[in-house]
Amino acid sequence: MEDDFDIRDARMPENEREYENVLRPLSLRDFSGQAKVVENLKVFVMAARMRKEALDHVLLHGPPGLGKTTLSNIIANELGVGFKVTSGPVLDKPGDLAGVLTSLEKNDVLFIDEIHRLSPIVEEYLYSAMEDYRIDIVIDKGPSARSIQIDLAPFTLIGATTRSGLLTSPLRARFGINMHLEYYDMETLTKIVLRSANILNVKCELNAAREIASRSRGTPRIANALLRRVRDFAQVKGNGDIDKAIACFSLEALNIDRYGLDQIDNKLLTTIIDKFKGGPVGLTTIATALGEDPGTLEEVYEPFLIKEGFIKRTPRGREVTDLAYTHLGRSRVGEQGFLFD
């Protein structure tokens, strides 16, 4: 159905980026979840402020929507320094990187999203910038080419990635602070939903917030996106307030089931069962059958399905689990005959 809620749109909808910014916490004190990460960051940030130095370079990795960008912004706020944002695909050539780096002031924070997508040549230029706060720029071409060394102000690079396994060892080794973000528990997500509802000036009952949280795939960005959609239903179909009944009605209308799975999740599981006898089957083959990008399946959908026990990785490919069969109301081929073999 064309009007089904696509879980990918919940990760950072372009037309709702302003809402995402409004709902972001601005300090470590206001940040919910990731307790160990937050406590360690408080120490590292305080130490850098006491020494009046740039914070060591930080690598944040984990599934989409867990707060990597938000934490990066908070770090800059806590340090009281400037914050510049770019991404790996945007930094196409060394000159692009040089332009960003030379614009930084002392102890500023540079956030590079999707840092695993940096081109090899740009990544090499980044090494000396991270280690020695300098870059070497080649002027002219051919016999007249010469290298000019440019000194940079001390800065903190925060790299964010959903696929840390794609980072090269030399780049990974240059991050002094390495932090993995985990999926959120329901209690924390419920607090986030209630906080966001308050900011959006909409009344949301505790049970309704729990219902939204339980279907948010452990991801704050999805919880906030679902809250905004439920708010729409509450205004049009109800009195504007969000209770459990309107929350359940809205989420069912969006085809988000009680596990937080959407239409593509269920289609993925069904495809493995119907076309590949439950697996094992390779990711590229699954992607072709679904008409989806393999990277999208691996980065966006698969982590949650694995975490919740619907699929598992094996040396021969992906397999669906008994939980997936039960969830879809299906039985394994030949299952009833086992007793009579």
From Swiss-Prot:
Q: Summarize where DNA binds, as residue positions.
A: 313, 318
Record note on domains: Has 3 domains, the large (RuvB-L) and small ATPase (RuvB-S) domains and the C-terminal head (RuvB-H) domain. The head domain binds DNA, while the ATPase domains jointly bind ATP, ADP or are empty depending on the state of the subunit in the translocation cycle. During a single DNA translocation step the structure of each domain remains the same, but their relative positions change.
Q: What does the record give under GO molecular function?
A: ATP binding; ATP hydrolysis activity; four-way junction DNA binding; four-way junction helicase activity
GO BP terms: namely:
DNA recombination; DNA repair
- Annotated region (Small ATPAse domain (RuvB-S)), positions in chain: 185-255
Question: Has keyword Mitochondrion?
Answer: no
Q: Which organism is it from?
A: Parabacteroides distasonis (strain ATCC 8503 / DSM 20701 / CIP 104284 / JCM 5825 / NCTC 11152)
Q: How does it assemble?
A: Homohexamer. Forms an RuvA(8)-RuvB(12)-Holliday junction (HJ) complex. HJ DNA is sandwiched between 2 RuvA tetramers; dsDNA enters through RuvA and exits via RuvB. An RuvB hexamer assembles on each DNA strand where it exits the tetramer. Each RuvB hexamer is contacted by two RuvA subunits (via domain III) on 2 adjacent RuvB subunits; this complex drives branch migration. In the full resolvosome a probable DNA-RuvA(4)-RuvB(12)-RuvC(2) complex forms which resolves the HJ.
Q: Mind telling me which GO cellular component terms the entry cites?
A: cytoplasm; Holliday junction resolvase complex
Entry superkingdom = Bacteria
Kindly provide the name given to this protein in its UniProt entry: Holliday junction branch migration complex subunit RuvB
